[in-house]
């Protein structure tokens, strides 16, 4: 089973964590500034009423507790927080795949500069969902899916 770390506790991070953990095919961890406000059981409800319920393996504000045991690190952050997050996780990234939901704000340039060659990189052109928090760290609404997604890999 692969382990995915979601960096970011906002609406997008909560929805992505809910959708991924719902499959039960991956273990999901969340790196957030406010771990005490998160529940281990989370859910997102889409605009058709489909419910994505999942259970998180771990929630922390300490990169050293989450990143080393993760196979994939996915930044679910606004562009202005990506560099700060990359610096936070850099000491613990060895050979993981590191990606960003928002990569059109310079993610690849920042990741090369900060991580060097220690990670495989990937990024989405745009966010895959429109998301809104219902209750922080517990539930969110997935208000719409993108019809098409583009992704870059290195």
Give short role names for the model-derived ranges:
Residues 1-51, 67, 92:
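NAD(P)+-binding Rossmann beta1-loop-alpha1 motif at the extreme N-terminus of oxidoreductases
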Residues 8, 32, 77, 102, ...:
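Short beta-strand/turn micro-motifs composed of small residues
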């Amino acid at each position: 089973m692969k382990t995915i770390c979601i960096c970011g506790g906002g609406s997008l991070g909560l929805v992505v964590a809910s959708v991924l953990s719902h499959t039960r095919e991956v273990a999901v961890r969340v790196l957030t500034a406010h771990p005490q406000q998160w529940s281990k059981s989370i859910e997102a409800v889409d605009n058709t009423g489909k419910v994505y319920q999942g259970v998180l393996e771990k929630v922390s504000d300490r990169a050293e507790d989450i990143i080393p045991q993760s196979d994939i690190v996915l930044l679910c952050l606004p562009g202005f927080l990506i560099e700060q997050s990359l610096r936070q996780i850099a000491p613990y990234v060895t050979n993981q795949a590191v990606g960003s939901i928002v990569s059109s704000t310079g993610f690849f340039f920042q990741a090369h500069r900060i991580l060097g060659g220690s990670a495989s990189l990937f990024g989405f052109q745009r966010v895959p969902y429109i998301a809104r928090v219902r209750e922080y760290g517990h539930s969110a609404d997935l208000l719409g899916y993108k019809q098409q997604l583009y992704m870059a890999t290195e």
